[in-house]
Amino acid sequence: MVLLFWISKQKAGEPMSERKTQQELDFERKHEEDLQRIRDFRLIDDDFMAAVFEDHDCAEFLLRIILKRDDLVVREVRGQYSIKNLQGRSVRLDILAVDRNNRAYNIEVQRSDRGASEKRARYNSSLLDANLTDSGEEYDALNETYVIFITENDILRAGLPIYHIDRTVQETGMIFNDQAHIIYVNSQIKDETALGKLMHDFFCTDSRKMYYPILANRVWYFKENEKGVATMCRAMEKMRDETAAEQNIKTLLVSVKNLMKNMNLSPEQAMDAMGISEDDRKMLLQRI
């Protein structure tokens, strides 16, 4: 009787050896969600944009169109590049490129207006100055820099496809040639110009609908090629881990500050009481 009951249960479901654990089911669900996200990615999405334009030729192509300079040659390019601010905390840039004349380009895509404010542009410009020169170098050694925001909305609200910002002398109108440039690209304008077609491509989820083959091929690689898809999946897993780690630090920071306030402790004493690891201590001390 027991044997018949066991056999009937086995027929009703999968063999025990083939049943999946909850962990395996969760992994498959998460993987399928990642694949769907990859299918929906566009170049206006910063993580995907960073992966595509980390390619040397794609970055060079992008800059040539935005700056209207066919002579521009990129020497090196990095995606999701971390640099330090004055407090020693890491700030991640979508793209950092340097050309053969040592000009530096920070390219950011921003879907929210707040992330592309005027002071954010100034902040990024200062980060480039602080990180691209060695200690003790003369100010004349500063790189010429470009901070380029590609924005989902028309941040400056003048209906133009592109805005160039340079310091000027108010009394004369002359350019103050500090060689620190800021550019806003309005992705709302998708006309038949080279820049308009580029902005069209920034909103395509399907590489077959893109104007520029050099970008379409790179988008296809990350969406359709097995190796490219695997690369994006690993990148997304890394982002999840980093997000979880950042949330953990924020939670610890609140607890440490509360303990310091309520018990009148120093940061070190509060972290000792909480048994915080050495790695987490270093990160917390930068923020307290």
PLM regions: where:
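Accessory alpha/beta interaction modules
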Residues: V2-D178, D191-T193
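Short, charged alpha-helical interaction segments and adjacent helix-coil junctions
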Residues: V2-R39, L43, D47, V98-R100, ...
